[in-house]
Amino acid sequence: MKIGIIGAMEPEVAHLIAAMTNATSQTIAGIEFIAGTLAGKDVVVTRSGIGKVAASIATTLLIEKYAPDAMINTGSAGGFVDTLAIGDIVISSEVRHHDVDVTAFGYEIGQMAQQPAAFIPAAHLVEAANKAIAQLGEVKAIEGLICTGDSFICDPVRTQAMLKNFPTMAACEMEGAAIAQVCHQFGVPFVVIRSLSDNANNDSPVDFDSYIVKAGYHSALMVMLLLEQLNPSAVK
């Protein structure tokens, strides 16, 4: 079993890379891919860069060059659930684009043409993540809808508009749905795991800078615990 792991920023992958053994590195199109062992599993970790295009490029290259059996997207997110605090975790129950609108052609809001409205993570990856929750200590984790768009959300007016379209949204970020869409195209199972760095409000720019390292660590910890729970035979 080989697992691809993608984070957008250095703090979101640094703890994973530091914990790897037998690591080798290859750079393609300016993106570094680090292959090795993590939590007893063969993994390939990469920092994609920020946004949906960067994430799509990195995901496609990782799948084409390394043929992973599953993909994990890790990192930070803005939170929309009152019971979660900064540093807590959202495991994707589904992933959607929040900034796509081709409803004029009969699609749902957030649904890209010729794509599903929601991308559903692999059950065995979500199951492994849920088993890992018990080992998180004081860090809380829930399953929920994660929405993706090419904007950092810190405007309450925009937040309310997003919640009108996606009332069950638990978190928003800038890469997950793009990674999920590429995985859907290639038939690669995926899950998105995000730790909250802010609450998608006016304080978000300050909170993000203050808490990105904490969020990156918690998300990386969750990924490593997930890998420990993952059954090598439970793929595809």
Swiss-Prot record:
Binding positions (substrate): G78, I153, M174, E175
E.C. number: 3.2.2.9
Keyword tags: Amino-acid biosynthesis, Hydrolase, Methionine biosynthesis
Positions annotated as active site in the UniProt record: E12, D198
Name this polypeptide is given: 5'-methylthioadenosine/S-adenosylhomocysteine nucleosidase
GO biological process entries: L-methionine salvage from methylthioadenosine; L-methionine salvage from S-adenosylmethionine; nucleoside catabolic process
Keyword Zinc: no
Cellular component per GO, a single term: cytosol
Enzyme class: hydrolase
Matches recorded under PANTHER family: 5'-METHYLTHIOADENOSINE/S-ADENOSYLHOMOCYSTEINE NUCLEOSIDASE, 5'-METHYLTHIOADENOSINE_S-ADENOSYLHOMOCYSTEINE NUCLEOSIDASE
One Pfam family hit: PNP_UDP_1
Family label: Belongs to the PNP/UDP phosphorylase family. MtnN subfamily.
Keyword Cell membrane found: no
SUPFAM superfamilies named in the record: Purine and uridine phosphorylases
Gene name linked to the record: mtnN
CDD domains (alphabetical): MTAN
Pathway(s) the chain acts in: Amino-acid biosynthesis; L-methionine biosynthesis via salvage pathway; S-methyl-5-thio-alpha-D-ribose 1-phosphate from S-methyl-5'-thioadenosine (hydrolase route): step 1/2
A single GO molecular function term of this UniProt record: adenosylhomocysteine nucleosidase activity
